């Protein structure tokens, strides 16, 4: 039996009320002074790390005892996290700091099922927690030789600017395409699998030169501000089955790389172009957000492209560092990321409970950590229509360049399993303290793993999804269920298509995906537009020039569909977005003639594309 020594760090425990104090969050008119008491369970003789994986604090709020349980946010950083800043002479300096022993936590209040907490424990406790439906902020009072903290409500912070802040997004963005509603029964198997898959957003943050000046030319202060913000964003998106990890941070500590200006529209366009032409070539990521110290025109606090995620030119947003309270800035950033993920502004009928929601057009003074029913529908319909691929990519072991972090749910180099922290792990096969398999276990997860043992050879582990797929079986030597599919070129869907990498791409399904249920393929005459070599019709691009289709290849260019809707009687319709010109082209492997399929904009023998 492991002996456990309960280490308690006790200070004065009596709270008292204060009338007014100037804190990092601003001038607070009504606050309560508390002295958090830390209670930590350590194995006897163990060395206490600087920041434990789990911590517990006790203090009183309004005279009532509160127990705050905290767990390290181990998914906060990606394995290849990097930081870039610039020397006074403009040299780029990029480092890969060890971030596994960070001080950022999520948590809950004991005996309060609806409670939440996002806390930095770097220098005392700083952040917010929800208690009995009320949102409180906590931060150290920074008194000499004292562990005193202030606990207060946001409403008691004096406002620097009474004018409400707004998001600048309107529905006239070129990147926005109206999304037709799709019921569950209309989903293709591929769309359903996509919806069910866990999503990952690799986030890159940039702080402009004014931010650097605002925080006293102190790189650590800017870095801390950014970390605090991401620590709030990650649990907001966890509820949407999206894991947000910070892959990189860049601080423009010498001069701005773009002309940051008070026109939010112009600044967003310039930032997005810089990301596409500069940042992406240096650091792989899915989404970038600029945090700026400039004041945008009017009440605008942020701006983002609607539906821009995974798009080279448009997966970006900008946010003004408009409040001393970091969680309000974090909500603004989560809001702009929401636009990138296909969510529009909430209407009056949208709800997420009693408080304002993340996608409200006006940024609320109240904490908004939930997405409304409308936002969830917007996001779902966006995913069904566009199926952005970058957010499906879970980091691979081979991507890891910094030390593996046991407890972050990612199986990395040197680990056999990773089931989370010792407190949350429920996997009988995995030792959460070492991320190694328990004695006698062959595996911890995988479709060919059953009760910690490999399933027998020949056991079916995945049924065939469709006629282009094959039933997959276990080898008896691995927990993995290797995906196999029918040979390419095999006829499918009543000879309307040919199997291509496990799928049966046919034009009819592609029209439905683009225009909704009821859409059909246009008549052959419509496809003759593909001989013009413009954005309405072409077969492929060479050096950014649209190449017209040859007569025999017209069905391997733009896809022409008939939506078959009361408001659209045009027999020849294409899906066109200037932000993603390739979307709406006939997919590779699609049947274009008898025994022929599309490959690189040409209609070739069915065996050629493979």
Swiss-Prot record:
UniProt-listed SMART domains: ACR, DISIN
Short sequence motif Metal-binding: positions: 335-346
Modified residues (Pyrrolidone carboxylic acid (Glu)): 190
Binding site for Zn(2+): 335, 339, 345
Annotated propeptide span(s): 21-189
Residue ranges annotated for the Disintegrin domain, each copy included: 403-488
Disulfide bonding pattern of the chain: 310-390, 350-374, 352-357, 406-435, 417-430, 419-425, 429-452, 443-449, 448-474, 461-481, 468-499, 492-504, 511-561, 526-572, 539-549, 556-598, 592-603
Binding site for Ca(2+) 2: 469-470, 472, 483-484
Protein name: Zinc metalloproteinase-disintegrin-like VAP1
Native organism: Crotalus atrox
């Amino acid at each position: 039996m492991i002996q456990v020594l309960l280490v308690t760090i006790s200070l004065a425990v009596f709270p008292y009320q204060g009338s007014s104090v100037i804190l990092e969050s601003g001038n607070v008119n009504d606050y309560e002074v508390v002295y958090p008491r830390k209670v930590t369970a350590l194995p006897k003789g163990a060395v206490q790390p600087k920041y434990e994986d789990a911590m517990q604090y006790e203090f009183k709020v309004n005279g009532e005892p509160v127990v705050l349980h905290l767990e390290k946010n181990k998914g906060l950083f990606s394995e290849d996290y990097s930081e870039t800043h610039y020397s006074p002479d403009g040299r780029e300096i990029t480092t890969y700091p060890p971030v596994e022993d960070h001080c950022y936590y999520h948590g809950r209040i004991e005996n309060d099922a609806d409670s939440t907490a996002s806390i930095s424990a770097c220098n005392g406790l700083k952040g917010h927690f929800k208690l009995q439906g009320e949102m409180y902020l906590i931060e150290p009072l920074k008194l000499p030789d004292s562990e005193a903290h202030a606990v207060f409500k946001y409403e008691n912070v004096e406002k620097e600017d009474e004018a409400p802040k707004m998001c600048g997004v309107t529905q006239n963005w070129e990147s926005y395409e109206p999304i037709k509603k799709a019921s569950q029964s209309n989903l293709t198997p591929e769309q359903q699998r996509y919806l069910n898959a866990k999503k990952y957003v690799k986030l890159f943050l940039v702080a402009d030169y004014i931010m650097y000046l605002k925080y006293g030319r102190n790189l650590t202060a800017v870095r801390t501000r950014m970390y605090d913000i991401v620590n709030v964003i990650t649990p907001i998106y966890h509820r949407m089955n999206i894991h947000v990890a910070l892959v990189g941070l860049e601080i423009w500590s010498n001069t701005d790389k773009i002309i940051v200006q008070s026109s939010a529209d112009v600044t967003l366009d310039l930032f997005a172009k810089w990301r596409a032409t500069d940042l992406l070539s240096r650091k792989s990521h899915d989404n970038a957000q600029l945090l700026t110290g400039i004041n945008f025109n009017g009440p605008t606090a942020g701006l983002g492209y609607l539906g821009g995620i995974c798009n080279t030119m448009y997966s970006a947003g900008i946010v003004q560092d408009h409040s001393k309270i970091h969680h309000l800035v974090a909500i603004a950033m989560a809001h702009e990321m929401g636009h990138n993920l296909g969510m529009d502004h909430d209407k009056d009928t949208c709800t997420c409970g009693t408080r304002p929601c993340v996608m409200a057009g006006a940024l609320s003074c109240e904490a908004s950590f939930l997405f409304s029913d409308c936002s969830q529908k917007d996001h779902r319909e966006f995913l069904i229509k566009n199926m952005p691929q970058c957010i499906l990519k879970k980091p691979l072991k081979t991507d890891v360049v910094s030390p593996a972090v046991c407890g972050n749910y990612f199986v990395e180099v040197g680990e056999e399993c990773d089931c989370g922290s010792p407190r949350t792990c429920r996997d009988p096969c995995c030792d959460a303290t070492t991320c190694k398999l328990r004695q006698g276990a062959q595996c911890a997860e995988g479709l060919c793993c059953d009760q910690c043992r490999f399933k027998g050879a020949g056991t079916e582990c995945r049924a065939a999804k469709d006629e282009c797929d094959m039933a997959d079986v276990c080898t008896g030597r691995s927990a993995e269920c290797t995906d196999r599919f029918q040979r390419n070129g095999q006829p499918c869907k009543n000879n309307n298509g040919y199997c291509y990498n496990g799928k049966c791409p046919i034009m009819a399904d592609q029209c439905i995906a683009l225009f909704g249920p009821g859409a059909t393929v246009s008549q052959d005459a419509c496809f003759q537009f593909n001989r013009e070599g413009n954005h309405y019709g072409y077969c492929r691009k060479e050096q950014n020039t649209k190449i017209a289709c040859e007569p025999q290849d017209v069905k391997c260019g733009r896809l022409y569909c008939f939506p078959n809707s009361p408001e659209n009687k045009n027999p020849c319709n294409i899906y066109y977005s200037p932000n993603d010109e390739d979307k709406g082209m006939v997919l590779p492997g699609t049947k274009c003639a008898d025994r022929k399929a599309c490959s690189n904009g040409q209609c070739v023998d069915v065996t050629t594309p493979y």
